[in-house]
Structures are given as C-alpha cells and as structure tokens.
Amino acid sequence: MITIDFEIDRPRNVSMHLFDIRGRKIRTIFEDQTFQSGHFQEKWYGKNDRGIQVSNGVYMVQFISDKKRIERKITFIK
C-alpha cells in the first residue's frame, strides 16, 4: 500500500490518476472531485482500474486542478 499525501490551498475540483512508466493510465483515484482547503491522504493498494494487482515498479501520480498539473514518481513494491 502507498499513501499519497497532498495539500489543497483553497476549495477546488481535483483529479488524481496513476500512470505506468510507459505513460498508460492504470488507475483513476478520483475524477473532478471537490475538496476544501487542507491536507489529505489517499491510499493506493497497487490495483489498476480493473482490480488487478500491478507489478512492482515506478509509477507516476498526476494531480490536476483548475489549469495546474503536477506529476510525481512513486515506487510500488508488494
């Protein structure tokens, strides 16, 4: 399991997606969800959108809010 921490500075709609190293979207954590300001955590248990366990490796977390896009690498190890 991986815990993904993020901060929201003001109320906004946010999407969070996970991509494999080849750039293929493997999981939508949430899509266009409204968050108030604050600190948040999402847990990812290493499964794709079909519920299949992914392989160990490096993945990209993508946050999209308004016109801002942030990406960061995470490493998943079972």
Listing of model-derived features with the role each one plays in the protein:
Residues 1-18, 44:
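Glycine-centered coil/turn sites that cap beta-strands in beta-rich domains
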Residues 19-26, 59:
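Short, glycine-anchored, charge-dense loop/turn motifs used at functional sites
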Residues 7-9, 22, 73:
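Intrinsically disordered, low-complexity regions of eukaryotic proteins
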Residues 4-5, 52-78:
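C-terminal tail/sorting-segment detector
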Residues 11, 25-54, 65-70:
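Glycine-centered tight-turn motifs at strand-turn-strand junctions
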